[in-house]
C-alpha cells in the first residue's frame, strides 16, 4: 500500500479450534491502519500464539510479547521498545542510518543472533550455559530483546 501504514496481527491459530487445521487467510488476520507519519505514543501488544508484523511504524514507548510466534519489524523506529518471546524468531529489517543509532540489548537462552555487518555492536557467548547476547551503543532509541528459544535477526537495507 503506497502511502499507507499498516500493522498485521495473524490470528490464524484460532482456526485450529474450529477446523482442527492451521490456516491463515485474510479472514483471520487483524490489520490495523494508522495514518501515515503518525507516531504511536504507547504500544502494548500481547499474544499467546500467532505472528506479529509491524511495518513502517514509529513507537515512542512499547512492549510487544508473544509466547509462541514470530515477530517481524520492517522499517520501524522507536524511542523505547521491549520485545519478549518464549518460542519464536524475531526479525528487524530497516535502514542502516536508523538502526545504527539504536541502543540494542539482545539476550537469548537457546537461539542464534544474526546481525548485519554494518552494525557496530558486540556479540558475546556464555560458554557455561550457551546463552548469546548482543549489545550496541547508540544515540537513538533503546531496543531490548529477550527470547528463550528463538533466533534474532537484525538486517540493514
Language-model segments: residues:
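Right-handed parallel beta-helix
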Residues: 1-65, 70-73, 129-146, 151-157
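Short, surface-exposed interaction patches in beta-rich subdomains
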Residues: 73-157
Amino acid at each position: 500500500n503506497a502511502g499507507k501504514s499498516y500493522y498485521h496481527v495473524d490470528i490464524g491459530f484460532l482456526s485450529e479450534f474450529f477446523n482442527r487445521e492451521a490456516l491463515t487467510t485474510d479472514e483471520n488476520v487483524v490489520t490495523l491502519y494508522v495514518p501515515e507519519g503518525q507516531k504511536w505514543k504507547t504500544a502494548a501488544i500481547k499474544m499467546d500464539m500467532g505472528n506479529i508484523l509491524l511495518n513502517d511504524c514509529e513507537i515512542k514507548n512499547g512492549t510487544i510479547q508473544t509466547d509462541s510466534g514470530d515477530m517481524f519489524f520492517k522499517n520501524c523506529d522507536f524511542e523505547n521498545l521491549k520485545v519478549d518471546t518464549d518460542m519464536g524468531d524475531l526479525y528487524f529489517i530497516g535502514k542502516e542510518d536508523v538502526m545504527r543509532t539504536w541502543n540494542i540489548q539482545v539476550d537469548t537462552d537457546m537461539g542464534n543472533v544474526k546481525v548485519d555487518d554494518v552494525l557496530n555492536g558486540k556479540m558475546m557467548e556464555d560458554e557455561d550455559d550457551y546463552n548469546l547476547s548482543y549489545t550496541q551503543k547508540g544515540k537513538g532509541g533503546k531496543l531490548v530483546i529477550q527470547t528463550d528459544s528463538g533466533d534474532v535477526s537484525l538486517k540493514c537495507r
